[in-house]
Amino acid sequence: MRSFLAVMLLATSTFVTAQAAPEKGGHEVQIWAGGGHSVSGGRGQTGVVNAGLRYGWVLTDSHLPGFLRGRFEYAVDAIPVFLAFQPTNTAYGVGFDPLGLKWNFQRHGRISPYLELTGGVLLTNHDVPRGTNTVNFMDQAALGMHVLGAKHNVSLELRYMHISNAGLATPNPGINSVQVRLGIGKFFGRHD
């Protein structure tokens, strides 16, 4: 954990001036990696590591009052790397999240917090969890923040992920995990 915090501090300390924050008509491009472990509510003893690419469209100007003030963004994620470390095997897979609903709160200095709901599909070489199916769906919720920099931003978030085959196979116990995700990206404004 100390190493992770040291890397985050080093990565964010190289940014001196603030870049464009999420704005209506702007776009987000990001590469990210994350990982975590299963929690109660499904099959346990499973670790998850994943990495992907994001493209987002900021659709609205700022609205709502007070601390809720922010902008709505729609995003898609391509996930070329997905590993599920299960007690009996390691499943390798790919995923695609075509539904990313993100609320970018009003920025405070270089910090731009956000909430996100995401949904998509996961295809693996082994059943996830074991004895179920190789085709699954992913529902996710995340709370994070962008640290805006001169050329790029660093994103850090806490993500809850539910993986389930949605009844395509029986049984359908699913896997629930809590993950930490780190991303490096850029917001492009309307005029970039």
Spans of features found by a protein language model:
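Bacterial N-terminal signal peptides
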Residues: 3-14
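Short glycine/proline- and aromatic-enriched beta-strand/turn motifs that initiate or cap beta-hairpins
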Residues: 16-60, 172, 177-192
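Short loop/turn motifs that connect adjacent beta-strands in outer-membrane beta-barrel proteins
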Residues: 19-26, 60-72, 106-112, 148-154, ...
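Residues that define the transmembrane beta-barrel architecture of outer-membrane proteins
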Residues: 25-27, 45-51, 90-97, 111, ...
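Transmembrane beta-barrel strands of outer-membrane/channel proteins
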Residues: 27-37, 74-82, 115-121, 156-162
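Residues on the lipid-exposed face of transmembrane beta-strands in outer-membrane beta-barrel proteins
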Residues: 31-35, 51-57, 98-105, 117-121, ...
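Extracellular loop and loop/strand-boundary signature of outer-membrane beta-barrel proteins
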Residues: 39-41, 86-88, 125-131, 166-172
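Gram-negative (and chloroplast) outer-membrane scaffold detector with strong preference
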Residues: 51-125
